C-alpha cells in the first residue's frame, strides 16, 4: 500500500526535547520527487539530503546542502523485496548519522516489527538494512556524494 503525500519527522537529542516540531531539519530523507521538492527548502544550510534512486535533482537545486543518493529501490528489488526500500534507506541513514550503532538500530527495528506481529520479516528486514548501511560506504568511497 502506498500512502500519498505521507511524511514523518523524527527528532532526537541527548537532552529533553521540549518542542517536537522541526522547522529546519539537519537531515532530509526523500524517497520521491514530491517530498524532495516540498521539504528541500526547509533543510538547514550544510544539511544532508538523502535521496532515493527515484528522485531527480534539478540543475537549479540548492548548492548549500550535501546530497547522498541511495539506490534503495534498486537494492530492494534486487533482493526480491521491493517494499523494503524504506528499510534500505533506514540502514543508510543510520550509517550516515553515526549516532546509533548498527546493532542497536537493528535491535530496535526488530522490536518494532515484533510488536506489530510482523516478526516473519526479520531476516528480510535485516538484509535490507545491511544493504543500505553498506551502500553508503560504497558511495562515499566512489565519490557518489554530490
Predicted regions and their residues:
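Active-site cofactor/cluster-binding pocket
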Residues: 4-146
Amino acid at each position: 500500500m502506498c500512502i500519498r503525500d505521507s511524511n514523518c519527522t523524527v527528532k532526537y537529542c541527548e537532552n529533553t526535547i521540549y518542542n517536537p516540531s522541526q522547522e529546519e531539519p539537519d537531515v532530509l530523507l526523500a524517497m520521491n520527487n514530491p517530498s524532495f521538492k516540498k521539504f528541500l527548502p526547509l533543510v538547514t544550510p550544510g544539511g544532508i539530503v538523502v535521496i532515493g534512486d527515484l528522485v531527480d535533482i534539478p540543475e537549479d537545486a540548492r548548492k548549500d546542502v550535501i546530497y547522498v543518493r541511495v539506490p534503495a529501490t534498486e537494492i530492494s528489488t534486487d533482493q526480491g523485496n521491493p517494499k523494503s526500500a524504506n528499510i534500505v534507506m533506514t540502514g543508510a541513514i543510520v550509517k550516515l548519522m553515526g549516532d546509533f550503532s548498527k546493532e542497536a538500530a537493528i535491535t530496535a527495528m526488530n522490536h518494532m516489527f515484533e510488536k506489530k506481529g510482523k516478526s516473519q520479516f526479520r531476516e528480510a528486514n535485516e538484509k535490507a538494512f545491511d544493504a543500505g548501511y553498506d551502500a553508503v560506504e560504497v558511495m562515499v568511497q566512489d565519490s557518489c556524494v554530490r
